[in-house]
Swiss-Prot record:
One of its GO terms (molecular function) is nucleotide binding. One of its GO terms (cellular component) is cytoplasm. It holds the Pfam family YfbR-like. This is 5'-deoxynucleotidase YfbR. Keywords: Cytoplasm, Hydrolase, Metal-binding, Nucleotide-binding. Substrate binds at R18, W19, H33, D69, D77, L78, P79, T80, D137. NCBIfam families: PRK03826.1 (NF003009). Belongs to the 5DNU family. Homodimer. InterPro entries: HD/PDEase_dom (IPR003607), HD_domain (IPR006674), YfbR (IPR022971), YfbR/HDDC2 (IPR039356). Catalyzes the strictly specific dephosphorylation of 2'-deoxyribonucleoside 5'-monophosphates. PANTHER family: 5'-DEOXYNUCLEOTIDASE HDDC2.
Amino acid sequence: MKQSHFFAHLSRLKLINRWPLMRNVRTENVSEHSLQVAMVAHALAAIKNRKFGGNVNAERIALLAMYHDASEVLTGDLPTPVKYFNSQIAKEYKAIEKIAQQKLVDMVPEELQDIFAPLIDEHAYSDEEKSLVKQADALCAYLKCLEELAAGNNEFLLAKTRLEATLEARRSQEMDYFMEVFVPSFHLSLDEISQDSPL
């Protein structure tokens, strides 16, 4: 059997730090970010289904979110101000992402490619799936800002403001629910969030 470097590459996502141009109280890597986005995306899909009459596959949404930044193992995490400096750069970066996604799919053994390609290639996502993953991605970036600000790092003030505008643009009923029910706890200390459930 032919060897595949697919998972060896993906394991290196933990070596790619996010927010590279900003001072961080705690560094966040792409691997841990992807896990958090998967958990939040799954929650958004579940909320949409249970509370607002949605009919999406929450488990698939979690998988899509888990792989949503996989191509960054080949491209790196380009800082947002660079990525969206102008429309031409944004377009070219999208093209580079597409090539990187295909390169990752090509690493997968041929008999498994039909399983992994729809998870890695964002063009295989439905509009609804893409929307939920993007909502979760923005929410997790926003939560990172809250954590940094709570630790006294004002470097994230402008990023928080920018992300609030992004969240408003992507606003949905499931996001409103998540923001109301889960986000306030991110402003609290460990002692405060542990009071109601001591071991």
